């Protein structure tokens, strides 16, 4: 007799459980367990079954995330436990004062010995929107914004659309209130803005603004289309632990035992427990530290990683780890005494756009630059910021006289994010692109299909000449130590250097007469120039500054042809035979050497005694064709040394991780590249692993 198949109720339960597990793997552990297509197929199966059996649909089904009607307005929610803000620290003195207050209080309560240091749980301060999730009997019952800390807005319908938020928890207490942050990854934010711009809709200023705007949509269907994420970092109400979970007792003072409503006795332990329930918790960079020195070391370490994280943070948070100690420390006004937010220097600030000028780059690219009223942002005072190109200015609707938001992240060049429209003055002026180069007067043209306008003056343009010479003297090209920007400015302005070949005719006598150049410095520079008379062919090709020809491409072309003469005479078809050289690069090289003036420069270099050396073939072929990506700081090798060794063995080095990456080589403070490699299944090596691969 054939065995009966599962009932619709059993099939629906199985599909829900399977989808729930996939959601946990993806959103909690950042470890997708099935391809997107397979996940989508499971959802379709569940939707079909529920359509056939509507009586079996429950509010916590994965299919019920979207579907609520648009709201007229958000209701109010009174927080059972206030959502307090944290006290802030902005410098080392603030952190040390906080640690001393905590230690003194705990010693006074008999919870810390005189020779002991306080143990803290350190976390990232996510730059998103604070949210409270209330689960009743394991089901998501309500979600609310922080609001004023006492009362927030009911955003339950919108929170339900975020796939990383579990609609049901297994093994949860009767009532569990979870606090956390809703945010948007930077890459997803950029994609959203591109979509918004393509539709002619408003673009967002930053990921936080996008997350807040998405969550406060009255129509949950719009929120469902936005790439929001949620991370839990604390809790509020907790009542009715599951049966079988033993009662735990705290000792808030020596000899005093109090029954606890919580299953763990440390903050870190509670976060682990929330993760075990299936909630997304951002545990990766969290760490326990002791004393003020430990806190400051954590702050510095995270500061170095900040630019590589996939999401924005605006600081770190220190919390006394032991929950009994937290209770003894208590609260003051609107903030806990046991926690502190240590802010990074602001990455965004507001200032006035005084004017827009244009800069001319090495290839003639015209870049609009904002002249700003001085503003302190990202740890430095900023007076200039990039506006990228004319299209970006139009897209952002930035006008001279506007109050604008300026962003500076890590070592990234400051940029104008957008205007504060409500502060726009009546006399704000739109930017008009110049038609002639401000340096040489040549026509400015914008090639069809490109966003960048360019000066047509070539090396006749002093600005292009300066940037070309600076590029050629750089470490990855001819590596002429001592030939920097200020010296090149003097040489070009004096009309002493008109082309790269003129560098090789400089004498110590004339150099010594220049500003800030003594006899010894001049002699050292001439010696460095002499050393650069026998560069590797690939370095010289890269030094010429041919558009679209980077360091690696120049080396590959040099190895393929073996001499400058053969490269200069190569047809586009011959250039396309070089591995990884496509039509754009081949066409660019061909056009460069079709220009008589450029061929003349190569001839002048030869006359000055510059004789490029053929590129050495790889020492072995063990890594032939394999692409490596480097991240973090290695204990012994510099990144340049590791790159040189990989290239010598026939490998390639790229700046970003993709499916084509053969290995990711990591050092200390590896950032988002490591996460991407793990997502794609790219093998990860440390320095020793790389050495072993190289046979060293």
Swiss-Prot record:
Signal peptide: none annotated. It comes from the Bacteria. Keywords: DNA damage, DNA repair, DNA replication, Ligase, Magnesium, Manganese, Metal-binding, NAD, Zinc. The active site is at residue 125. The keyword Magnesium applies. The keyword Transferase does not apply. Gene3D superfamilies: 5' to 3' exonuclease, C-terminal subdomain, 6.20.10.30, BRCT domain, DNA ligase/mRNA capping enzyme, Helix hairpin bin, Nucleic acid-binding proteins. Its EC number is 6.5.1.2. It catalyses: NAD(+) + (deoxyribonucleotide)n-3'-hydroxyl + 5'-phospho-(deoxyribonucleotide)m = (deoxyribonucleotide)n+m + AMP + beta-nicotinamide D-nucleotide. One of its GO terms (biological process) is DNA replication. InterPro entries: BRCT_dom, BRCT_dom_sf, DisA/LigA_HHH, DNA_ligase, DNA_ligase_AS, DNA_ligase_CS, DNAligase_adenylation, DNAligase_N. SMART domains: BRCT (SM00292), HhH1 (SM00278), LIGANc (SM00532). GO terms for molecular function: DNA binding; DNA ligase (NAD+) activity; metal ion binding. NCBIfam families: dnlj, PRK07956.1. HAMAP family: DNA_ligase_A. Belongs to the NAD-dependent DNA ligase family. LigA subfamily. This is DNA ligase. It comes from Bordetella parapertussis (strain 12822 / ATCC BAA-587 / NCTC 13253).
